[in-house]
């Protein structure tokens, strides 16, 4: 089954990640994208902490596409298993 859009969860300053979810049927898949990956995608300078959600929303389609690709490839990390996206995940 293909992943579908879940929800924005929050920006975690101490970990420098944005947490979000994707949905597989009726199961939520926890996901995270590093702020450095988002900055690299946007070729942005320093983004203020209060702008991370807005930045995520601008990049959401690209981030979720890559999360879906990692899901299909079963590239899970962590406990509970989820998808973690870093800058290298967007290099082609």
Q: What function would you assign to each model-found segment?
A:
Residues 1-27:
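Short, charged/polar N-terminal "headpieces" of proteins
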């Amino acid at each position: 089954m293909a992943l579908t859009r879940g929800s924005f969860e929050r920006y975690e300053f101490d970990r420098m990640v944005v947490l979000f979810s994707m949905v597989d049927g009726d199961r939520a898949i926890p996901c995270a994208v590093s702020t450095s990956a988002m900055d690299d995608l946007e070729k942005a300078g320093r983004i203020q902490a209060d702008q991370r959600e807005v930045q995520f929303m601008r990049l959401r389609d690209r981030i979720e596409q890559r999360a879906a690709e990692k899901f299909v490839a079963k590239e899970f990390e962590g406990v509970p298993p989820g998808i973690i996206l870093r800058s290298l995940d967007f290099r082609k």
